[in-house]
């Protein structure tokens, strides 16, 4: 069992249950999944870009990424239906908590000019979305092997009913929010 998973089970869930006034422990909000998405639009011209993006994503997540293909053809972008244009990974259970631990304790502190996570990035249903502009902030990525600096989107899906509950949950996991 991962460190954060154990911490959630033994401490965080009990504190949240009392704070939110929930009678049943199954009602307490928890993190359901983390989805990481990397757009590789310039992979149309060069297959090596797609390969390096997939490699970096698998190093970061510890799981093989799924290639995302274009749904429609767009002539102005020289894009045809079915062309690979990105990759994504959905993390659950053990790997999710391990990734969350690395994200909060190692990656976020390494971001340049970081002033805290925006609290406006909640979607109204208790899910949090954030973007990372450089993949080199992750410790798994070797700076020497990086061909191009790429960003990624991270979506944290929770079972929380409101944004306030989700913010309390993520704050318990030591997410550095602004203010």
UniProtKB/Swiss-Prot annotation:
GO biological process, one term: translation
Full protein name: Large ribosomal subunit protein uL5
Keywords: Ribonucleoprotein, Ribosomal protein, RNA-binding, rRNA-binding, tRNA-binding
Function according to Swiss-Prot or TrEMBL: This is one of the proteins that bind and probably mediate the attachment of the 5S RNA into the large ribosomal subunit, where it forms part of the central protuberance. In the 70S ribosome it contacts protein S13 of the 30S subunit (bridge B1b), connecting the 2 subunits; this bridge is implicated in subunit movement. Contacts the P site tRNA; the 5S rRNA and some of its associated proteins might help stabilize positioning of ribosome-bound tRNAs.
Subunit structure: Part of the 50S ribosomal subunit; part of the 5S rRNA/L5/L18/L25 subcomplex. Contacts the 5S rRNA and the P site tRNA. Forms a bridge to the 30S subunit in the 70S ribosome.
Gene Ontology cellular-component terms listed: ribonucleoprotein complex; ribosome
Family statement: Belongs to the universal ribosomal protein uL5 family.
Gene label: rplE
């Amino acid at each position: 069992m991962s460190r954060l998973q154990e911490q959630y089970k033994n401490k965080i869930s009990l504190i949240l249950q009392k704070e939110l006034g929930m009678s049943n422990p199954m009602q307490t909000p928890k993190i359901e999944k983390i989805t990481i998405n990397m757009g590789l639009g310039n992979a149309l011209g060069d297959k090596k870009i797609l390969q390096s993006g997939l490699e970096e994503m698998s190093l970061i997540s510890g799981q093989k990424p799924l290639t995302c293909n274009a749904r429609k053809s767009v002539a102005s972008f020289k894009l045809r239906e079915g062309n690979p244009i990105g990759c994504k990974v959905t993390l659950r259970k053990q790997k999710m908590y391990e990734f969350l631990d690395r994200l909060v304790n190692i990656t976020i502190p390494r971001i340049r000019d970081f002033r805290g996570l925006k609290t406006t990035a909640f979607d109204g249903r208790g899910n949090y979305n954030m973007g990372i502009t450089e993949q080199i902030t992750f410790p798994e990525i070797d700076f020497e092997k990086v061909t191009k600096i790429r960003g990624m989107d991270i979506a944290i899906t929770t079972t929380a009913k409101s944004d306030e509950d989700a913010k309390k949950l993520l704050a318990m996991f030591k997410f550095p929010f602004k203010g």
